[in-house]
Amino acid sequence: MKKILFLFLAACFFFSCEKETIVIPQQHAGRTVLAFFWADNSLNSSLRDNIQTMMQGLQAMKDSAALLVYWDGEASDISWPEPCIVEYVTNGQGGINSLSKGTIDAMMADKNTSIYDLIGIGNIRKKYPPQTSTEKTVMQTVIGDMMSAYPSESYGIIFGSHGSGWLPTITGTRSIGQDGGRYSSDTALIPELAEVLRTVNPQKFDFVLFDACMMGCAEVYYELKDAARYCIASVLDIPAAGFPYASVMPYLYENAIKDYLGPICKDYIDYYNYIGWGTISAVDCNQMEGLAEAVRSVILSNQDSLKNVDTADLQQYGKGSSSFKGYAYDMLQFIGKLCGGMAPDDFTQQLKKTVIYTDYTHDPTSSLYRIDGDNYSGMGMYIPNSFTTPKYLLWNNYFKSSIAWYHASGWAETESIWGN
């Protein structure tokens, strides 16, 4: 009887152990690219088109690679009415997921194939109930889920939606993302986004690419210095079509990503040189602390001249609307004006270390976005002021209370001068 009882208990122990076995997903070699698309807004169709061009870019890959897209679009979306993570894995021979290159090429060539059919070949890895995807906890959960779904040696991440740099969330402006209609206040704040990225990936993302307007400013880059190695962004508006992913995607998987930041930016400018407008910069976020110190040194050494710099004489990058006017000015031009006409060599050298590559369209289709190349450095920055209009009062208060660049770059120590 005892023998039978022993065998019974042993069997129970064996099966209970079987149930508790944890399968650890295999880590994939190389880099996986994540794309976080806030698409419940006027960019819905453009972001959907971006996924198709991303697929074309994956088809050009010579090695296997994975792209995971988080999509939070309109409830009426045919493909994905609910927020979800969608996976696209190329075999390095033009095939994606279970479909061969020939099959995908035929689908793309067939005029009867809809965009929904094309992007619908993605594997849905996880669905979510309706949620506000600009909330900090939601962003953290989703990006963590994306990384868990496809464990890799490293990651790069793309953010696609509306944007307006470091600005606080008010009617007409949004730091990054818009989850809802045109006037929705459901947007993400850059300090919160940076904290999310630091939390989910302490080893840092290889890059952050902002496919969103006006993210190319010192305030944004500085927040990301402990979250990403490199950042690609525009200080101007980005046309709705976004990045030319068909040509850019293969670069995003290269091991030595720093060597391909230039080609990524060049492809962007080449794409818009004759059909749009734009600026683009690739920034080494590891150099942002040094840049903050360089700016701080100049500001503190020239405090008496702060009041003499007229921002009306500077190139400002909030060109698309009066709501954005003054959000960022050219950093190099400002420092030069502050120093009496010429920026110090040590500052200029640090700026060159920080901005690895930058360019702009020389003949934009809209004169609104024409750039003064003689006063363009690829790095925007906010210049606080004593204006008492509601816009600037809100901006200055948020700048002082929430943006780390304010304290790092010398503005906090000189408030008694510029704030009066």
What are these regions (language model features)?
Residues 29-32, 62-67, 151-156, 202-207, ...:
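Loop/turn elements at helix/coil->beta-strand transitions in domains of secreted/extracellular proteins
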Residues 40, 44-57, 136-148, 217-218, ...:
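Short alpha-helical segments and helix-capping/turn motifs at coil-helix boundaries
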Residues 21-73:
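Acidic/polar, low-complexity intrinsically disordered N-terminal segments immediately downstream
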Residues 25-26, 144, 148, 172-210, ...:
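Terminal, contiguous helix-loop blocks that mediate binding/assembly
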Residues 120-129:
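Short glycine/proline- and acidic residue-enriched helix-loop micro-motifs
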Residues 42-47, 76-80, 165-169, 215-220, ...:
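Extracytoplasmic/secreted cell-surface and envelope-processing proteins
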Residues 73-75, 82, 86-117, 131-201, ...:
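Catalytic-core segments of thiol-dependent peptidases
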Residues 1, 5-33:
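Bacterial Sec-dependent N-terminal signal peptides
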